[in-house]
Amino acid sequence: TCLIAFALLGIGSTILQVSLNPLLTNVVKGNVLASSLTAGQVLKAVSSFCGPFIAAFAATVLGNWQYLFPIFALLTLISMGWLMLVHIREESPEQSTSSWGATFGLLKDRTILLLFLGIVFVVGVDVGINTVAPKLLIERCGFDVTGAGVGSSVYFAFRTIGAFVGTFLLARVSGSKYFRVNILVAIAAMIVLFFMSGQYSILVLIALIGFTCSSIFSLIFSMAIQARPEKANEISGLMVTGIFGGAVIPPLMGYCTDLIGTQAGSLIVILCCMCYLLYCSVGIKTRK
């Protein structure tokens, strides 16, 4: 029963990710789209942050942590009702339903293919940094496993702050320039991270990487939709499948770490992903 419930939660979460982004394109356009997608990432991060507190409230006040499930169900029903009451005029350029083949056929478009790989690598960077941060503190600073978790916490916190700041900046500045500047700073921080062994210097660099990479997922997503706006639904579904990068990059990191013998192997893999993202920021042009 629990496995079925978790499967349904995963399916529902994926459906939301696929459907909400093209729905948003009917409300906002251009650079504001990237800003709005980033705002969605902020809300998602804040919601994730609140989850443990809701569980604690259910356990201490209501007497059982399992009461968080009815609370989540109620919040979901409220959100669904709210969305149903909001009138959104949806564009319907095509009446036919796209097949799997037609959706993945979009990868024949060079721009869509490059941006799809961008999603794969940016998710890989996100999961990779979250994974390697505690290991760096253990390897270079002598932290124990429990204390090393501060690395992931710092990354997550500054990723949320960066997405919040990006929400406002992307409504005022060019998305391509914002993308370019942030990924350049992230690459610089990553290169410096190879040589740092102090606790605070490592945490500062991890924070900087989290801050600068926070809006890149949304920027790539909006670039893909702007490249083929008439295929927004198909592109949204296609891009969401790119999150499998979070399952592909960490094993590569592990292999390189074993090969080299230090976490520098993991950093090399992440740096290569960032270099590809730099190419996306300067080599891919989409319509405004």
PLM regions and their residue ranges:
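Extracytoplasmic gate region of multi-pass secondary transporters
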Residues: D109-S153, A157-A163
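Glycine-rich segments within core transmembrane alpha-helices of 12-TM secondary carriers
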Residues: V32-P52, G237-I249
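Helix-loop-helix hairpin linking two adjacent transmembrane segments in secondary transporters
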Residues: A39-I88
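Intracellular juxtamembrane helix-capping segments at the cytosolic ends
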Residues: I15-V28, S214-R228
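Helix-to-loop junctions at the C-terminal end of transmembrane segments
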Residues: G162-G175, T257-D258
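C-terminal transmembrane helical hairpin of 12-TM major facilitator-type secondary transporters
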Residues: S176-I220
